[in-house]
């Protein structure tokens, strides 16, 4: 099973883009060359701000969704310190209990 990664890319205007991939370097190069997400095209210089392995694709999708819900301040803490990332992953791996 190929591991999936969550990554954040910083744009020239200091915005953070969140995505998932199986190959961070390849995906970053795609974004740099304008062949990645439309949201990053024409945004100037891009820098890889954060990346971390998250497991399988299902978990990666849930982690991406959760990170996209964070405030800019929380994302900046994640980039600077990895703050809360382990807890975020742990919460996503906990099986959900459905009530009848």
UniProtKB/Swiss-Prot annotation:
Lineage of the organism: Bacteria, Pseudomonadati, Pseudomonadota, Gammaproteobacteria, Enterobacterales
Family that this chain belongs to: Belongs to the UPF0213 family.
Name of protein: UPF0213 protein YhbQ
HAMAP family assigned to the protein according to its UniProt record, in alphabetical order: UPF0213
Tree of life domain: Bacteria
All copies of domain GIY-YIG, residue ranges: 2-77
SMART domains found in the cross-reference section: GIYc (SM00465)
Disulfides per UniProt: none
Gene coding for it: yhbQ
Pfam families to which the protein is assigned, alphabetical: GIY-YIG
């Amino acid at each position: 099973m190929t591991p999936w990664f969550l990554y954040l890319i910083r744009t020239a205007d200091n915005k953070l883009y969140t995505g998932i991939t199986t190959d961070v370097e390849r995906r970053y190069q795609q974004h740099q060359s304008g062949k990645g997400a439309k949201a990053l095209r024409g945004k100037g210089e891009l820098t890889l701000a954060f990346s971390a392995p998250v497991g399988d694709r299902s978990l990666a999708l849930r982690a991406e969704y959760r990170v996209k819900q964070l405030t800019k301040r929380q994302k900046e803490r994640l980039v600077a310190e990895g703050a809360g990332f382990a807890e975020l992953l742990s919460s996503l791996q906990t099986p959900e209990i459905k009530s009848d």
